[in-house]
Swiss-Prot record:
It is found in: Plastid, Chloroplast. It comes from Nuphar advena. Its main location: plastid. The keyword Chloroplast applies. Part of the 30S ribosomal subunit. This is Small ribosomal subunit protein uS12cz/uS12cy. One of its GO terms (cellular component) is chloroplast.
């Protein structure tokens, strides 16, 4: 607990909030180019081959982004839109690729939760 004299000498510093997605630089999404598309395994107790992409963003950052949904068409040099949002069982993956925009097509035959996977309403 500081004394009044100490508080006069230097005031309390406001708490700085640390962003969970620094590579986006305060933007809701960022465009980037895939440099590598590959699979990684989640941490215990889960088991799978999760699809991820290494993306070089327009902000200059090189990040690892998760590719949601079943099946994708991404390869090296694909241009993608990246949003924030981590994947809990993949350490170091703090971003998601937005499906249905730029080079990332929507998930095929998706009926429910279509808006999250870039799928138009079926006729």
């Amino acid at each position: 607990m500081p004394t009044i004299k100490q508080l006069i000498r230097n005031t309390r510093q406001p708490m700085r909030n640390v962003t969970k997605s620094p590579a986006l630089r305060g933007c809701p999404q960022r465009r980037g180019t895939c440099t590598r598309v590959y699979t990684i395994t989640p941490k215990k107790p889960n088991s799978a081959l999760r699809k991820v992409a290494r993306v070089r963003l327009t902000s200059g950052f090189e990040i690892t982004a998760y590719i949601p949904g079943i099946g994708h068409n991404l390869q090296e040099h694909s241009v993608v839109l990246v949003r924030g949002g981590r994947v809990k069982d993949l350490p170091g993956v703090r971003y998601h690729i937005v499906r249905g925009t730029l080079d990332a097509v929507g998930v095929k035959d998706r009926q429910q939760g279509r808006s999250k996977y870039g799928v138009k309403k079926p006729k």
